[in-house]
Amino acid sequence: MFDILAITAPIYVAIVLGYGLTRWGVFQKSDMRGFGTFVIKVSLPAMLFNALSNTQVKEIFQPIYLAAYALASLATLALALVWSMKFKRESFSLSSCYAMGMSCPNSGFVGYPVVLLSLGPFAGVVLALNMIVELFLIIPILMAWADAQEGKNSAVQVVWQTFNGMLKNTLLWGIVLGFLFSWFEIQLPQSLNRSVTLFAQASGALSLFVIGGSLVGLSVQGMGPRVSQIAFGKLILHPLIMLAVLLWVLPISDPVLRAAAILSCAMPMFGIYPILTQKHGHEGLSAAALLAATMASFFSLNGVLWLLKTQSI
């Protein structure tokens, strides 16, 4: 168990450090937005490009992994929508909030450092594969679903607007350029490659620091039942569905990819969760769920890592 804690402890120390220094006023919470923007728009794209451009195409192209990850995320999304709409009688937008919280893991800020420390340098490729599913499938579906009840835009319009926004997403361009450099076996000049590597190396620690600082001031008061349901769906249901997919639907022979798929689904929800739900007035619930899931993930992630190490999954 101590070797598992050796993997997760540095991650949560960085999160706690971000929280503590922001809580004590060394940094302002508004500073986290600038740090987060740097990570999302510069550091993570550099890391994705670096990881993909230095990996052979046959290692990047993992169609079974993509299909399994997409299927598990879609199944979690569907169950969340059915639960919230049919049993809880929630609105389209609030149901989308539930589903987004349960099916969209924090692949970049938390997932990448965890997978990197537990499975090694293949973490960059895993992050790219996860983001392809999240950016092109899960998020567009949920954004369209949230707007469906209002009738302001058709689902097709919402999806088109989402895809149009992705063209400005530097994460996407990091993936595309990294894949092209790998495909055509292009090498950057050594000096430029070192510069890209410098930016890439900043992603891990800074992303975790941002998560910690962003949690300052959040509260779950008065939202316990809803928050606990969303956190349970993200930390327990999503990885269990992924495990079921791997066992009975789309088995993955590579143990590293198999572990990466389960670990990815076991992450807390992504950091922009409150931002995406703000349009419909659900940012308070989203922020509370993000806080609860991030705190609880210390225990759930250690449990998942222990199971992956001790059981033949």
Where is each model-derived feature located?
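Alpha-helical transmembrane segments of multi-pass small-molecule/ion transporters
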Residues: M1-I313
